[in-house]
Amino acid sequence: MAKKVSAYIKLQVGAGKANPSPPVGPALGQHGVNIMEFCKAFNAQTQEMEAGLPVPVVITVYNDRSFTFITKTPPAAVLLRKAAGIQKGSGEPNTKKVGTVTREQLEEIAKTKEPDLNAADLDAAVRSIAGTARSMGLDVEGL
């Protein structure tokens, strides 16, 4: 018989940087999950990614306190900030532009995000990422 799910926990944790301190420890502790076991498994799974890059993770906790987790791709905004070389987006995206991204950079980000985007093809994914870039105050070249 299948195990019964008791909770889903959604977190954003830096790649390779999971540790028992907040936010990871309290979120898992209240569901009775072995925190160190999760931290070791998560860090092992994300070790090939750039250290510290925020990675969304969905943890499924079962009644017997066992768990499974699925890592997603880093948020588009983080990848766009890295591509544009900026610290944060614009507070007034329509009036103050803070950087520029090219179509090639957007395609690279779209290929990275492809598993998590529900776009029909690469072009639709690029347009979606371009919309995120515009809302952050980035100029989009070549689109």
Curated annotation (Swiss-Prot):
Stored InterPro entries: Ribosomal_uL11 (IPR000911), Ribosomal_uL11_bac-typ (IPR006519), Ribosomal_uL11_C (IPR020783), Ribosomal_uL11_C_sf (IPR036769), Ribosomal_uL11_CS (IPR020785), Ribosomal_uL11_N (IPR020784), Ribosomal_uL11_N_sf (IPR036796)
Keyword Ribonucleoprotein: yes
GO cellular component: cytosolic large ribosomal subunit
SMART domains: RL11 (SM00649)
Pfam families listed in its UniProt record: Ribosomal_L11 (PF00298), Ribosomal_L11_N (PF03946)
Keyword set, alphabetical order: Methylation, Ribonucleoprotein, Ribosomal protein, RNA-binding, rRNA-binding
Top-level taxonomic group: Bacteria
Entry's Gene Ontology molecular function annotations: large ribosomal subunit rRNA binding; structural constituent of ribosome
Processing after translation: One or more lysine residues are methylated.
GO biological process assignments: translation
Function: Forms part of the ribosomal stalk which helps the ribosome interact with GTP-bound translation factors.
Subunit note: Part of the ribosomal stalk of the 50S ribosomal subunit. Interacts with L10 and the large rRNA to form the base of the stalk. L10 forms an elongated spine to which L12 dimers bind in a sequential fashion forming a multimeric L10(L12)X complex.
Family to which the UniProt record says this protein belongs: Belongs to the universal ribosomal protein uL11 family.
Protein name, as recorded: Large ribosomal subunit protein uL11
